[in-house]
Curated annotation (Swiss-Prot):
Protein name according to UniProt: Transport ATP-binding protein AarD
PANTHER family linked: ATP-BINDING CASSETTE SUB-FAMILY B (PTHR24221), GLUTATHIONE_L-CYSTEINE TRANSPORT SYSTEM ATP-BINDING_PERMEASE PROTEIN CYDD (PTHR24221:SF261)
Source organism of this protein record: Providencia stuartii
Keyword vocabulary terms for this entry: ATP-binding, Cell inner membrane, Cell membrane, Membrane, Nucleotide-binding, Transmembrane, Transmembrane helix, Transport
Gene: aarD
Family matches, as SUPFAM superfamilies: ABC transporter transmembrane region, P-loop containing nucleoside triphosphate hydrolases
Residues that span the membrane, as ranges: 29-49, 62-82, 149-169, 170-190, 250-270, 276-296
Main localization category: membrane
Binding site for ATP: G383, Q384, S385, G386, A387, G388, K389, S390
GO CC annotation, single: plasma membrane
Length: 588
């Protein structure tokens, strides 16, 4: 990572501290008050020791300083607790803001773009890398200011009593940040490499875990174990690199702080022996001045030590910020354009003219296409894998950029508000996704205010009621991760019930019967065919017999519509559809 990039990332991190500026200021104020209490604590200790050792003052006369000293101890402890909570709140506010930005960005980019990375990599970015920014905001930023303020306060407290001790501290203090910077020059880059290795490990491990059955069927266990072992070893070595730099930096800090404190102690020792006679403005060096300086000397370097400790929090945050900034600035070579126009709430007509669909990296996937879909017309789309069928659906969902024109009821798609347009879409894919915890929450995902009668109608029409009695808690049954309690067919029926419950103007179906058993396939397709009669429908499918009553059938290949017409027309004429039908008949 070059210096310019690192500076940009630090600037980005500081910009996002504005949302927590109030908490940051409170944390700094508490730190300054804590610094004043440190000076007061040293002052009372020095007064008590001077009185007891040099002046032989009776203890009864020192009751007030003892009480004040105890009060300072209690106040410092309270301030430490409060400051920890304020610091945590400061980091929490920023983390929530950044996480919302990342999630909104992923939503804007759409699932097509997100699928370009393994799920484990996204989990690392959204969870771990954002969490690793916590200490930068809660500790490093406040400490960056306190590291300059508190030492100056301590110098001001010592200087009136002994300028030599103050001068020693003043002269040695700059050595710590200088050597800290030299030692930690590559810390941000090391943290960045560590995050990359962690993302790679998370992605590969999660993908292998999900595909464990397939790997075992093809005897790939040993090869994949070796790959995970290599990723783990890479992550281990990069983690140890970060720790090595952290320990080296801490060692440098402790060394120079110890040397400086030792010089102050030697100075006062020789002064008390009469060997040195300077530093106290021509007066004898008092025990009070010596105790005050020696008690405050470690506290003088403590903010700098803390800054050195938290410096690695900064390096960690910079390393995490690189992938976050890269994500937030990502639009691909082709950006999905959106508008704010409200779509017309009426039966959907779609008209495409010289339509070309592109991936986010600028590759043309489909086109050019010219077609018109009339209101409540049903279209079935066939084609080999990679023909462009799913890309067409993803375009209509607003997840892919395009050139040319595609109009919805006369309005250009890119001019419509994406959220309002998607609110008119009913969607069932081939891999049902049930993100909520319970069955009822997943069914009501698109319409949380649905009545009991509407819910009952949806689960009856989608044949969810067939397996509902087998679930332990009925509609309130927890489904587990990836809907583990349900079979694929049952999960697809839940997805259909969710679509039935949500009012829509256009129905998009992407292989809704894929991977289903015969019983579930029959149930799902019967329900969807009934639903398709009520609205404009585009269905990508491989089930030829389900398209007999559809208004048009499109056959796609290499991003083009190479044949279109009604089932009876296409089955009787020469072409890809007739060949596909003949091939299917031979299989049966």
């Amino acid at each position: 990572m070059d210096k310019t990039r690192q500076t940009e990332l630090v600037r980005w991190l500081k910009q996002h501290s504005t949302s927590a500026k109030r908490w940051l200021r409170i944390s700094m104020l508490l730190g300054v008050v804590s610094g004043l209490l440190i000076i007061a604590q040293a002052w009372f200790l020095a007064v008590i020791l001077q009185a007891l050792i040099m002046e032989h003052t009776p203890r009864e006369q020192l009751l007030t300083p003892f009480i004040l000293l105890l009060a300072v101890f209690v106040l410092r402890a309270l301030l430490t607790v409060i400051r920890e909570r304020v610091g945590f709140r400061c980091g929490q506010v920023v983390r929530q803001e950044v996480r919302n930005m990342v999630l909104n960005k992923l939503q804007a980019l759409g699932p097509v773009w997100v699928k370009g990375k393994p799920a484990g990599s996204w989990a690392t970015i959204v969870l771990e890398q954002i969490e690793d920014m916590q200490e930068y905001y809660s500790r490093y930023l406040p400490q960056m200011y306190l590291a300059g303020i508190i030492p100056i306060m301590i110098l001001i407290a010592i200087f009136p009593f002994n300028w030599a001790a103050a001068l020693i501290l003043f002269a040695t203090a700059p050595l710590i940040p200088i050597f800290m910077a030299l030692v930690g020059l590559g810390a941000a880059d090391a943290n960045r490499r560590n995050f990359v290795a962690l993302g790679r490990l998370s992605g590969s491990f999660l993908d292998r875990l999900r595909g464990l059955d397939t790997l075992r069927l093809f005897f790939r266990e040993k090869a994949e174990v070796q790959q995970i072992r290599e990723s783990t070893e890479d992550f281990r070595s990069r983690t140890m690199e970060v720790l090595r730099m952290a320990f080296l930096s801490s060692g440098v800090l402790e060394f120079f702080a110890s040397i400086s404190i030792a010089i102050v102690a030697v100075y006062f020792g020789f002064s008390y022996l009469g060997e040195l006679n300077f530093g106290s403005y021509g007066l004898p060096v008092t025990m009070f001045a010596g105790f005050l300086a020696l008690i405050l000397s470690p506290e003088f370097f403590q903010p700098l030590r803390d800054l050195g400790t938290y410096y690695h929090a900064k390096a960690q945050a910079v390393g995490a910020a690189e992938s976050l900034v890269t994500l937030l600035e990502s639009d691909g070579e082709q950006k999905t354009e959106t508008g704010d126009k409200t779509p017309q709430d009426k039966p959907i007509q779609i008209e495409a003219n010289k339509l070309e669909i592109y991936s986010h990296d600028g590759q043309r996937l489909v086109g050019p296409l010219d077609f018109t879909i009339e209101p409540q017309q049903r279209i079935a789309v066939f084609g080999q894998s990679g023909a462009g069928k799913s890309s067409l659906l993803n375009l209509l969902l607003g997840f892919l950029p395009y050139k040319g024109s595609i109009k919805i009821n006369g309005d250009e798609l890119k001019e419509l508000c994406p959220d309002k347009w998607r609110a008119l879409i009913g969607w069932v894919g081939q891999n049902p996704h049930l993100p909520e915890q319970t069955l009822i929450e997943n069914i009501c995902l698109g319409k949380p205010t649905a009545s009991e009668a509407e819910i009952q109608q949806a689960i009856d029409d989608a044949y969810v009621s067939e397996f509902l009695p087998m679930l332990p808690d009925g509609l309130n049954t927890r489904l587990g991760d990836y809907a583990a309690r349900l079979s694929v067919g049952q999960a697809q029926r839940v997805a259909v019930a969710r679509t039935l419950l949500k009012p829509s103007r256009i129905l998009l179906l992407d292989e809704p019967a894929a991977s289903l058993d015969a019983h579930s396939e029959k149930r799902v397709m019967h329900t969807l065919n009934q639903l398709a009669q009520q609205q404009t429908t585009i269905m990508v499918t491989h089930l030829l017999e389900e398209t007999v009553n559809y208004d048009q059938i499109w056959v796609m290949a290499n991003g083009q519509i190479i044949q279109r017409g009604h089932y009876a027309q296409l089955s009787q004429s020469e072409g890809p559809f007739a060949r596909l039908l003949a091939h299917r008949s031979e299989e049966l």
